[in-house]
């Protein structure tokens, strides 16, 4: 995610300089960009946070940042960062592309930014306007609670799976280099094998013919 953060470093520099009470929290295994070290007193680096503790951490901030550089890979990412923040009533400012652009209603239940100018303008607005910030977060929570939790959709999902169930399944992955998203896909592949399915993996690059994980062996 370093490229994603570096994309908005010029914006963060201006905001931290203009708003001395502003604090930036960076969670995850990332290095602080050199350009931001001047504002080290306003920046907290937290490192890896256990997933069970992450909602509480997101709830502790006023604005959740989700910048994404415009790449094919990022356009295929989900809107999970918006969902995670919405469920704890924290407003999200995200790049206007991919699933964010499809899911988030700009100014209604989140904030979408196309370029550096919009990032600067909209983040300063959220910093200055607490009522607007809380209203957007509240609407995001309401919509996410209705549309994005399994309590309302689990039955429909199960019915769809039963209708389309196939004991032979294929997963198409960009590569076999392990990342968060690929790891999740492989865990689902293991679940399907345990349920009796035959699973094959397809990759867009690489020469591996088999993938081995514990007791599981997948043809690639």
Q: For the regions a protein language model found, what residue spans apply to each?
A:
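Conserved catalytic-core segment of nucleotide-activated headgroup transferases in glycan assembly
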Residues: 1-59, 184-190, 195
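Nucleotide-sugar-dependent
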Residues: 3, 50-57, 62-84, 93-102
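Short, polar loop motifs at secondary-structure junctions
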Residues: 27-34, 96-99, 204-207
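Flexible glycine-rich beta->alpha loop in the catalytic core of nucleotide-sugar glycosyltransferases
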Residues: 30, 70-71, 91, 98-99, ...
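Short acidic active-site motifs
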Residues: 52-53, 118, 122
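Conserved acidic donor-binding segment of nucleotide-sugar-dependent glycosyltransferases
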Residues: 106-117, 125-131
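A charged, aromatic-enriched C-terminal amphipathic alpha-helix characteristic of glycosyltransferases
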Residues: 131-162
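N-terminal strand-loop element at the rim of the active site
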Residues: 174-179, 197-220
